[in-house]
Amino acid sequence: MKVGAVNWRRARAQHRLFRRALRAAGAHLLELPFVHGAYDCVFAKDNAVLLEKRGQRRALLASPVFRQRQQEQQARARVLDRLGFDIFSPPPVAFEGGDLAILPGGRGALLGYGQRSSQRAAVMLEIFLDAPVTPLELKDPHLYHLDTALHVLSDGTALVCPDAFTPAALRTLERTEGIRQVLSVPREEAIGFGLNLVEVGSTVFVGARTAWVQALLRAQGRCPVELPLDQFHLAGGSAACLVSQLHPAGPAASDARPLPSSRMRPEPSPDSGQGPSGYLQ
């Protein structure tokens, strides 16, 4: 992945276009404020896993590896609290939201580990989701989050870059309940953020020119919409990184108690400015 200086005017224009496209496709958006000094906070997916059960919103905060992302978490906890989320303290091991893929119907999830998240995070994720979590080992340092190496469509079709996973992880994926079929995507398209997708109904937003991925999507009855997000590629993310979906709880989800909110609620401080979008479906 190429990392370089971002043209902030172009980035803001691309972000506004992305927000408009999501709304036009039927997504409901919540705006999260920019965290001053934490420039990667635009990648809202990494901060927390969001879940809704019987009208109650819950947020499991992430445990980012790098200090640059760690400094976002208290500000994000305050905002999510104001939005009505019960705040769950983060796992005691490394975990970032970009390494979790919720399976259709909320019946389980996939956890990418080995780069930014720990396999041991699966234990707390299973408690939070009240659903099985299947760990998959990532081996390519250039595909460091699960959402750069894999996307699971709403029908259970998994678009996968095989080069990103260990052989054992690929075998596990193919046997995972909820995965209907596995379709391979070449590494060059995954490296270009071709699997960092956002699905809203039959529309799938793609932040890069990826002929292979878009052909697969059309073959599955989806309508790929390509949007310019190259300025975010320079910072290491694309469409899926920019949003955090509020997932419906699976049929087995129970009424778990949130950890004491005071553990993650420091003294309030003002947040200002407009930043990334989260979307609810």
Regions found by a protein language model. Give the residues of each.
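The feature marks the mature, well-folded catalytic cores of soluble enzymes
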Residues: 1-265, 278-281
